[in-house]
Curated annotation (Swiss-Prot):
It comes from the Bacteria. This is Uncharacterized protein YpaA. Pfam families: DUF1304. InterPro entries: DUF1304.
Amino acid sequence: MTILTIILSLLVALEFFYIMYLETFATSSKTTSRVFNMGKEELERSSVQTLFKNQGIYNGLIGLGLIYAIFFSSAQLEIVRLLLIYIILVALYGSLTSNKKIILTQGGLAILALISSFF
């Protein structure tokens, strides 16, 4: 993999660790409220907290998967591309069902990283 692909993929991993932080550890914070466009009262509901924390673990594992692929895997490029495609597809689904900006905010770096992986 090129240095550019590694850097972009690491940035994607950091983005997903940040999303995990918001969803799992800062569930009812002002930042989480702003990022997810939800009221603080809604975020403080027990059912929403449970759902967010569960989703946060998924996002953290995506970040961890990218770190593993970049630094430890013998199939580095294959696993990175697989995870980037997964991220892009989820962002596309989110942009169709939730907020059109998700394709750029969640998928933008992943799209750039995937494109760079072919050069």
